[in-house]
Amino acid sequence: MDFYSQIGQDRIVLKYLKNKKNGTFVDVGCGFPKHINNTYLLENQFDWTGVSVDLIMYSEQDGSTWNDCRNTKLIVKDALTVDYLTLFKDNNLPVNIDYLSMDLEPPDLSLECLFKIPFDEYQFSIITFEVDKNREGDEKRINQSREFLTSKGYVLIGSLCSGQDDVYLHNSLTWLTNEFQFVDEEIIWTKR
């Protein structure tokens, strides 16, 4: 199977959700429709549906656009101006969404956007959240995201690529952490 995400986010989601078919996702800061995209594989090989948000509609190197590669909706808009509660309702997303991917540049924007997600109305099974710990001023921002997600019922289970992304499971699913410890040549996965 070909994986498409940059640092293994799609692998982690499939591993923990046991290759789930017909799941749902929200991909904020999705980037390209296929290349280094965290949800392309989920949609195209596992029949997931969802909604993605990015400031720009990127094209692949071959010139293909989102509409050429994907069936799910792309909202081309500044992620910080999106009303996520309305977006989720208008797109008939279930209250229990399988995957939330947050990957905005710079990472400060990911944190600001995280606070806009309606966690009191929606629950996510797994979240990958870009913290990019090697950037200046990262410790405070990382601690804020971790404290916030913990307060919303999520458990930090590890990081990808030495702190590029934090990975969370909803506390109702933490029994899954006993089943897997993910390490391979391409992805550095550290269980916390």
Model feature map: region roles:
Residues 2-83:
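SAM cofactor-binding core of SAM-dependent methyltransferases
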Residues 79-84, 163-167:
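A short acidic, often aromatic-flanked loop/helix-cap motif at beta-alpha or helix-coil junctions
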